[in-house]
Structure formats: structure tokens, C-alpha cells
């Protein structure tokens, strides 16, 4: 069974990453079980693996920029924004990463439908979900994953 955890207060990105890495290591050793973490971060920009190599800025408007080992480009995290970290063993579940991302998007689509908010996908390369507002698509669900050792 997957344990759901809510980390209260605004968390430093680096501290959460350290905790997550320890948990994932223990999962790979079959010491820890799968968990899903819900939290808010202190203001931070993260620069994923698709960020251009020329991008060498340490902060934007006095907000730190941290290079991270997940897919995607630059993403802002901050107070009031819910961040969800599913620590799931895909190898054990016999799921590939594309099916997993599709499942995450499907869950979000169904959850938002309950509040009469219709979300849609764009092309396969551009993962995440969009909502329509004032005749314009606004991306409101961002998915940036790191996949290592089947987790």
C-alpha cells in the first residue's frame, strides 16, 4: 500500500531532494515502501535536463535557480503551489515511463473534472496538461520526472 504524506510548511528544494534520494535508495534495497509526498516549496526555480546548456544563471529576481536531474526546462516552485512527489517503483509494477506519465495525466484530468475544470493534453513531446481561459490554453499541470533503478 502506498503511504500518503503531507509535509507541512514551505520546504527548501535541496532538503526535500536529499530526503527523497535517501528514501529512493532504501526503496531500491526493499527497506522502504512507496510513498506520495504533497508539499509546498520556498521560492525556487529548477532547471531540468532540457534547459539550454548556455543557461548559467544562479538566480532570477533574487530567487535561486537550481540545476536538477529531471526532465524538462525551467520551472518555478513556490508558496501556494502544490508539488506532488510520487515515489513509485515502476519496475516492481511492470510499468514503463510513458504509461506512467499517461496515468498521472489521466488522474489529474479526472480530479479536475470533479471541479468542472476541463484539462487537455497537447502533443506527446510537451507533457503536462492545459486548461482553457479567455480563449487561450494555459499550462497548469507540469510533469518533471527522474527515473532511476526502476523508481
Report each predicted region and the residues it spans.
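N-terminal lobe of the biotin/lipoate ligase/transferase fold
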Residues: 1-132, 137
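Conserved, well-ordered active-site substructure
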Residues: 146
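Conserved phosphate/anionic-ligand binding catalytic regions in large, soluble enzymes, centered on
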Residues: 149-151
